[in-house]
């Protein structure tokens, strides 16, 4: 069984996630090769010593690889899996294919169709930034993060063990979920929070048309709450497109909570206080701060 320190890893996508992964794996595997279709990204990856070698073509990048990590947007991952599927002459014996996509159902379905010499494992690290690009790569990005692994029925124990080793090497902790459960939970905790931030920003922009002083009052609370609205639209469209039903269900649940709050504002103040205190207590329990006032 191949140990991580002997593995040759290819990372497709020299952006925030792929670049951060390459930095975090430095010295922990035999070799890392980057792949990116963008010439500027390839040059930056080499100039910044993010990877020692980089290719423009996926096929060239996996010639000697033991592990292929797809660190590209969801839509590109699906295209890359299709490309791997087309190469019926196996790209490499026992090539472990791990993706970092933010949705899993469509990706796992595409992985099922990979040739037999590919050994796929679905993945999704629950970390990132609202900014994209290799210039924001950080070796500590994955540290302390939950890293979802979604093995297929065809995933070998060796491939899953190697995926676990990658997760541990970058300082994350693995959580095994099936694709449908992942997509439902990610909709509630990641995808809908982005939409809520967009709605908050849109409502504020509309209100500022009548009174531009609004932006002078928008301090740290507003900035923190609306931060996700700065996320790449192209990336988020891929995510929303491949997770429509769970996102819609989670969005309707949020609307129900907003309606509830509107009703509490019109009713008994004691009931409103009870609701707010309950939510505050849950927040403190789930995400303990250093101190609360």
For every predicted segment, state its role.
Residues 1-67:
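NAD(P)+-binding Rossmann beta1-loop-alpha1 motif at the extreme N-terminus of oxidoreductases
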Residues 8, 31, 119, 146, ...:
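Residues at the starts of beta-strands that form the adenosine-phosphate
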Residues 68-69, 98:
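N-terminal Rossmann-like NAD(P) cofactor-binding module of classical short-chain dehydrogenase/reductase
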Residues 71-73, 101, 151:
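Glycine-rich, N-terminal phosphate-binding loop of Rossmann-like dinucleotide-binding domains
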Residues 79-135:
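Rossmann-like NAD(P)(H) cofactor-binding subdomain of soluble oxidoreductases
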Residues 141-227:
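Internal alpha-helical scaffold of NAD(P)-dependent oxidoreductase catalytic cores
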Residues 211-279:
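Interdomain hinge/lid region at the active-site interface
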């Amino acid at each position: 069984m191949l140990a991580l320190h002997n593995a040759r890893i290819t990372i497709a996508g020299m952006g925030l996630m792929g670049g951060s992964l390459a930095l975090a794996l430095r010295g922990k595997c035999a070799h890392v090769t980057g792949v990116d279709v963008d010439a500027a990204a390839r040059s930056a990856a080499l100039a910044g010593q993010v990877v020692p070698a980089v290719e423009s073509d996926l096929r060239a990048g996996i010639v000697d690889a033991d592990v292929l990590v797809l660190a590209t947007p969801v839509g590109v991952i699906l295209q890359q899996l299709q490309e791997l599927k087309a190469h019926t002459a196996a790209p490499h014996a026992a090539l472990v294919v791990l993706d970092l996509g933010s949705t899993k159902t469509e990706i796992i379905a595409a992985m099922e169709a990979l040739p037999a010499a590919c050994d796929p494992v679905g993945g999704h690290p629950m970390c990132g930034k609202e900014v994209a690009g290799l210039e924001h790569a950080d070796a500590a990005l994955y540290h302390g993060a939950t890293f979802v692994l979604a093995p297929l029925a065809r995933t070998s124990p060796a491939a899953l063990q190697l995926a676990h080793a990658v997760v541990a090497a970058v300082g994350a902790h693995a959580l095994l979920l099936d694709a449908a459960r992942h997509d439902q939970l990610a909709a509630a905790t990641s995808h809908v929070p982005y939409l809520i931030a967009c709605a908050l920003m849109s409502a504020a922009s509309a209100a500022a048309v009548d009174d531009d002083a609004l932006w002078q009052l928008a301090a740290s609370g507003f900035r923190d709450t609306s931060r996700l609205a700065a996320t790449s639209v192209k990336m988020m469209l891929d995510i929303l497109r491949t997770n429509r039903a769970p996102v819609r269900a989670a969005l309707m649940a949020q609307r129900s909570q907003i309606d509830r709050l509107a009703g509490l504002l019109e009713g008994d103040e004691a009931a409103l206080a009870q609701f707010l205190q309950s939510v505050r207590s849950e927040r403190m329990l789930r995400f303990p701060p250093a101190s609360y006032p």
